[in-house]
Structure formats: structure tokens, C-alpha cells
A protein has these predicted regions:
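C-terminal "cap" of GNAT-fold acetyltransferases
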Residues: 175-226
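Conserved acetyl-CoA-binding loop-helix of GNAT-fold acetyltransferases
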Residues: 118, 124-137, 165
Length: 226
């Protein structure tokens, strides 16, 4: 398992035999995945809002709410530049997404990927696979299920194939009322969780690669001089 707080991965990580198609080559590169820093939020916002129709737009207030509340909010860095980000919430989180609510109505304990965004110039270079390896290594120590959605109205085949190659399957569909977008609700069972839970309960070892959930992050206030 990769380190949680900061991991340097050869990306993309070697998939399981059923994940690598014959004849497809991979170019190794160095990617660092680490917790986001508050001063990077403007860059994260720009990445999100330039991602196209497959990702819902954000405003600064909602992004700061993610920063303050998300259990997992990490960025990928390559050559000193942000290459993407992933935001996730545990099932007990105070998160107001309608897709998160859809899962919460049906499953008592899960980890939800709210969004993953990869910079356009980095797509196809393994950043997404590096993120999913990292978020799974975090989630499987704490949750039995990993959940997300794929929008079906914007050329979904690449995203569906990507998630299928990681073992996700559709468990239903949801029409998002505010934006009238139909989403494939996808889930993956995390096979390591039962053993981890039985062996350690809530007392995971204090190891660097195990890490800890992000704590609530108060927004920094700037002095006004008044």
C-alpha cells in the first residue's frame, strides 16, 4: 500500500492481470499524491471549472467547504505543478451532494468519491490510476465499499471503462434534479476491509502509510487592520 500523507508512485501502477489489455504500453513517470494546501485552492478551482461537462462546476465557497469538511482531499503533483485532485467523504460526513445522499439511503457504511479531476495536459498519463490506487488504499482500511458516480450524458464510455477496470459495477442510476443529469451509481467492494476491521477495529496502527482522516480545516482569516 502507498503512503497516505504523501506518496511517490510510479504511475500508472502496474494493474492486476485482468486490468491490462494486451498490446497497451505504459510510460512510467513520477507523481506525488499529497493533501491539498489552502493556498492551492484557487488552482484547484481553475482545474475543476476547466474540466468540461463531465464535472460539475464549483464556486469558491463550495470548494472551501470541501477543504473544511472533506475526509480526503488530495492533489497530484508532477514536475512541481498540480496535475489533478480528488475529493472524498466518508458515509458519516455532513455532505450535501444528492448522489452522496443516494448512496447513504441504501448503504450504511461506505467511502464516496465526490470528484476526480485531471489536468487536460496530463490525461492518459496515469494520474487517474495513481489517484484511485491511493484512495483505495486509504478507504479499504476504514470502509467496506468505495462509491462514485459517472455522468451518462456526456460521452461516458471512457469513464465507465476506467471504473470497470478497477472493479466498479453499476448498482443503480440517479437523475440529479438540479442539473437534470443522469448518473450511473457505481460501487466496489473492498475485500481487505473485513480482515482489517476484525483484526484492528478502530485502532489502526500509527504508521506513515496508514495515515489519518483529514480533520476539519478552519478557513484562514486575513487581518484587515481594523
Amino acid at each position: 500500500l502507498p503512503p497516505v500523507r504523501q506518496s511517490r508512485l510510479a504511475a500508472p501502477p502496474a494493474p492486476q492481470p485482468h486490468q491490462r489489455p494486451h498490446g497497451v504500453g505504459f510510460t512510467p513517470m513520477s507523481i506525488v499524491i499529497r493533501d491539498v494546501r489552502e493556498h492551492e485552492l484557487d488552482s484547484v478551482l481553475a482545474l475543476n471549472n476547466n474540466a468540461g461537462s463531465a464535472i460539475l462546476p464549483l464556486d469558491s465557497a463550495r470548494l472551501h467547504a470541501f477543504y473544511e469538511k472533506a475526509e480526503y482531499f488530495r492533489v497530484a503533483e508532477r514536475d512541481g505543478n498540480l496535475a489533478g485532485f480528488l475529493v472524498g467523504f466518508g458515509s458519516d460526513s455532513d455532505h450535501d451532494s444528492c448522489n452522496f445522499a443516494w448512496f447513504k439511503e441504501r448503504y450504511p457504511h461506505f467511502f464516496y468519491i465526490d470528484r476526480i479531476v485531471v489536468a487536460s495536459r496530463r490525461r492518459g498519463g496515469g494520474v487517474g490510476r495513481a489517484f484511485y490506487a491511493d484512495v483505495q488504499s486509504y478507504a479499504e482500511l476504514r470502509y467496506p465499499l468505495l462509491c462514485c458516480e459517472v455522468f451518462l450524458d456526456h460521452g461516458a464510455d471512457p469513464a465507465l471503462l476506467f471504473h470497470g477496470s478497477f472493479g466498479f459495477h453499476e448498482v443503480g442510476q440517479n437523475v440529479m434534479p438540479d442539473v437534470d443529469v443522469r448518473a450511473s451509481m457505481m460501487m466496489k467492494e473492498l475485500c481487505s476491509y473485513p480482515w482489517v476491521r476484525e483484526t484492528y477495529g478502530d485502532n489502526l496502527p500509527d504508521l506513515p502509510w496508514v495515515g489519518r482522516p483529514r480533520r476539519p480545516q478552519p478557513r484562514t482569516s486575513l487581518a484587515t487592520g481594523t
